[in-house]
Amino acid sequence: DYIVDADAENYVMVSPGTDIDEESLPTYKAIGGYLSELIPDEATIEVGLGRLNAASLMYLAPKRDLGVHTEVFGDILMHLTETGVITNLKKSEKRGRSVFTQVSGTEELYRWLDHNQGVEMNNCQEVLNPGTIARQHRMTAINNAVEVDLLGQANSEFLKGKQHSGAGGICNFASAAASNLEGKSIVVLESITRNGKFSKIKPFFAPGTPVTLPRTLVEYVVTEQGIARLVGKSPSERAKALIGVAHPKFRE
């Protein structure tokens, strides 16, 4: 490995969740409300990439003393820290600090992070270690999916038959959260595609579609239609719960 010292502008982007269009607002608000039901005070959260996750987290304002142990730190986590929702005071490890491996967001976020004693950017081997994650207080993994089948399997990588994104640390966080005594592994997605033509809750995936998260690591599925609680349920019970959070026009 080599380290090269060079001057360069920060890589900035519109942070997911800060550019919400009015049409999507009711969906984000509904999902945020359901997430708020599942996330207890003092939980340590991991938030996967994506506009849906970030926008929905804006509705966690009533929560207290949340902590952060995540892969990517974005503007929404900065805002929740500034408003006192995130304090990191109840974390089991790295108390008082948000821990992450990457940053993705605006120039304001980079300035906020600079010399901030309340954050720690560490290597992937440390942050994504399932043992480290599982030790966190009330570890709650919140990850998005492209689609979920009626077994509860999640595809977070393929879109229209092509690789759309990588898996990242999703399996590490989901497995660790599921093994945590007070933890939760949550998958979030809209129930229907933007054009309204296709359900994101599928009877089964198309051939060749990868399973990013197996059904054993998906404990809750949240859409704007509600919460599917899958823990301890049989395949038929899981299917019934997932149909309940599908869009009404696709439930038959």
Question: What residues fall within each predicted segment?
Answer:
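Conserved phosphate- and dinucleotide-binding cores of soluble alpha/beta proteins
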Residues: 1-252
